[in-house]
Amino acid sequence: MVASSTVPSVASIFAPESLLKKTKAQKQSREQIVAAAAEKKSARQKKRELIAKRAEAYEAEYRAAEREQIELARKARAEGNYFVPHEPKLIFVVRIRGINNIPPKARKIMQLLRLLQINNGIFVKFNKAIKEMLQVVEPYVTYGIPNHKTVRELIYKRGFGKVNKQRIPLSDNAIIEAALGKYSILSVEDLIHEIYTVGPNFKQAANFLWPFKLSSPLGGWRERKFKHFIEGGDAGKRDEHINGLVQKML
C-alpha cells in the first residue's frame, strides 16, 4: 500500500495563488449549494408532514362536532323537547339578480359584499351588521348555512385567490402560504378550516378568496325566482337548503 504524500504536486506549486483561491471558493460554493438544497428538501418534507397532520386533526374535529349535534338532537327528542341549533356563525350568500332596478343603498351593499355579478357567491361571518345588510339586499340574493361539504367543494372546485389584485387559481399550497402564511394558514385544508369554523383570521381568509363565480343552477331557477324562498321563489334566507342549491351551481 502506497502511503499518501503531503508533498505538493508540481501543478499546485506553479499554480497562481488567485487560481487556488478561486478553486477553493468554487468548492465551498458547491458545498453550500448542496447543503442549502438538502435543508430546503428537509423543510418541505416537514411542512408536508405538518399539513397532513393538521388535515387529520381537522377531520377528527369535524366528525366530533357532527356527533355532538346528533347526540344533542337525540337527547332533546328523548326528553320531548325540540332541538334548536346554535345560531350560525357562517353564511354563504349568492347574488341571483342583475343590475336593473336595484336601489342605490342595495347596490352599495352589494359592492361592499363584493357581489358584483349575478351568480357570485361569498362567505360572510354572521353578525348584527351582516344581518342588517342582508335584510336590505334580500330580494336580490339568497343565503343560508353552508355545511362542511359545501365549503370544501366550493374552495376546491371554484376557489381562486386574490394575489396582487389578480384572480389566481388555488393550484398550489404555496399560493395560500404566500398570502396567509403569517396567519398560520399554509394549505387548502387550513383555509377550509378557517372559513368553516369562522376562525380568528376569518376576515383575512375570506378576503383572500375571490368571490366565487358559480353557474346557473342545474335545472334552472324556480319559476318565481324573485319571490322569497318560503313563498316558492329563490330569494332570501333558505338556511340549510343553500347546500342543495350550491351543489346545482358547481
Curated annotation (Swiss-Prot):
GO terms for biological process: cytoplasmic translation; maturation of LSU-rRNA from tricistronic rRNA transcript (SSU-rRNA, 5.8S rRNA, LSU-rRNA). It is found in: Cytoplasm; Nucleus, Nucleolus. Pfam families: Ribosomal_L30 (PF00327), Ribosomal_L30_N (PF08079). It comes from the Eukaryota. Signal peptide: none annotated. One of its GO terms (cellular component) is cytosolic large ribosomal subunit. One of its GO terms (molecular function) is structural constituent of ribosome. Component of the ribosome, a large ribonucleoprotein complex responsible for the synthesis of proteins in the cell. The small ribosomal subunit (SSU) binds messenger RNAs (mRNAs) and translates the encoded message by selecting cognate aminoacyl-transfer RNA (tRNA) molecules. The large subunit (LSU) contains the ribosomal catalytic site termed the peptidyl transferase center (PTC), which catalyzes the formation of peptide bonds, thereby polymerizing the amino acids delivered by tRNAs into a polypeptide chain. There are 3 genes for uL30 in S.pombe. Component of the large ribosomal subunit (LSU). Mature yeast ribosomes consist of a small (40S) and a large (60S) subunit. The 40S small subunit contains 1 molecule of ribosomal RNA (18S rRNA) and at least 33 different proteins. The large 60S subunit contains 3 rRNA molecules (25S, 5.8S and 5S rRNA) and at least 46 different proteins. NCBIfam families: uL30_euk. This is Large ribosomal subunit protein uL30B. It comes from Schizosaccharomyces pombe (strain 972 / ATCC 24843) (Fission yeast).
